[in-house]
Amino acid sequence: MAFQRPGVYVQETLNPVQPIAGTNSEFITAFVGEDDRGPINTPTLVTSWNQYVTLFGSWNSYTNNDVPLAVYMFFSNGGSQLYVTRVAASPGLSTRSLNDRAVSASATLQVAAKNPGRWGNDLNISISNSIETGYFDLVVYSGGTTDSNVVETFTQLSMTASDARYAPTNVNVVSNYVTLTDLNSSNTGTTRNPAVVVNQPLAGGSVGNAVSVTEYTAGLAAHDTVLQSLVLNLPGQTAVNVVNAAISYAEGRDDVFVVVDGIDNTPADQLVRSGQYTPSSLAAVYYPPLTITDPTLAPGATTGRTLTVGAGAAVAGLISTTDNSRGVYKAPAGLQARLAGVVSTRQLTNANLDSLNTAAAPVNAIRFIPGSGYVVMGARTLKAGYIDKYVPVRRSLIYLRKSLTDLTQFAIFEPNNEGLWRRLDATVSSFLTQFWSQGGLRGTTPSQAFFVKVDAENNPQYLIDQGQVN
């Protein structure tokens, strides 16, 4: 490992004895994929289905439903918070320019959809006079122009920049649907206010081009601003180059674990596909896809319709609940690892299960177990061989690395002497003792579970002279 800047560097040593590690995970889930609306390449924290609907809309009309279905399954399986990042390829932005009230009218205000996409073409706006003279009201409609389609109303707006009710400032801060731009009309006073209009549609929005690995790579890179460790899923995405881009991002950060959706095909086909993915301990595949009752049906519609979704989002929700109830040391698998909302899956034979589990790129099976329901019965990463082939081992190592890095930040630029070594020893030992006591490390005593060495033997003078402490 090269040491090129001041900081804390943690090196892993995978010993033959397998640790059980983990507790109170710092992980947060992240979904990256296509959506009708929402900010592009901007990880957006959502803590409920309703909040997702507010920020990204409900079921998609112009792109696939992989992301909204993933969000729905995540929260249905106990997930509490996640980042959603929309990816898109050059989508068009819906806009409408409004003229002012002068006799020689000129453009005064542009109303644009909050973000690009064809969804913005479903917006309409109306401008009316406010109760107070010299101000105007703005009404935003979505999906129609009746009172039931009103989604936002803004009253007593002004086009005077010095006014406390200046329209762009007041609307852009709070609106989930539109942004306003002052077009700097050459007219003055209240004549700069937009003229009264009724149900004017926005236009120009488009889905854009087909999304490729380029857009996914940009969406992944946007998570560099998220400092927490991530459980990452690309809802519905099984393309080799895209999944491998996610694995590459995880390996570059070393605190990201990728949950990969299995393909909607036979176990043999899944084994071929998994073998094409990068053999990394930072990723795991879950198969087969899940059949669920279609949640996109309108209230009162005929029930019983089902659809198929990737397993990754439900597994991400399960990982979140397992982390909170047990810790990262516990594999998100077993008879208690029930996936909610599942009505059926492809049935796997014992021979299928054997091949999935023993393959060079193992696949974690989801099975129906009488008395337990549809449960995850696998905890293997895509890396075969060493002990980090197990999901809880790799995620525990991520947790330990990040925790120890955070806990020892105080050591940067401290005098590298016995006093610092004692502080580091005490800090790390205290953390690992607590970690062990909660079930994260094997051993009946702390000394059997771990050791901490910070002394003159592993800190010789030549390393001290280089500014390192080990």
Model-identified regions with their sequence ranges:
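Gly/charged, well-structured mid-domain segments that form the phosphate/adenylate-handling core
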Residues: 170, 183-186, 428
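Long, low-complexity, polar/charged, intrinsically disordered or flexibly structured peripheral segments
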Residues: 188-211, 216
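Extended, Lys/Arg-rich, non-catalytic nucleic-acid recognition/anchoring regions
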Residues: 106-169, 175
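Acidic/proline-rich low-complexity IDRs
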Residues: 97, 156, 179-182, 201
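Structured, hydrophobic secondary-structure cores that serve as assembly/anchoring elements
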Residues: 1-103, 110-116, 130-133, 141-144, ...
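Generic detector of low-complexity/intrinsically disordered segments
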Residues: 100, 159, 182-185, 204
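Short, surface-exposed polybasic-aromatic patches that bind anionic ligands, especially phosphate groups
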Residues: 45, 54, 180-193, 197
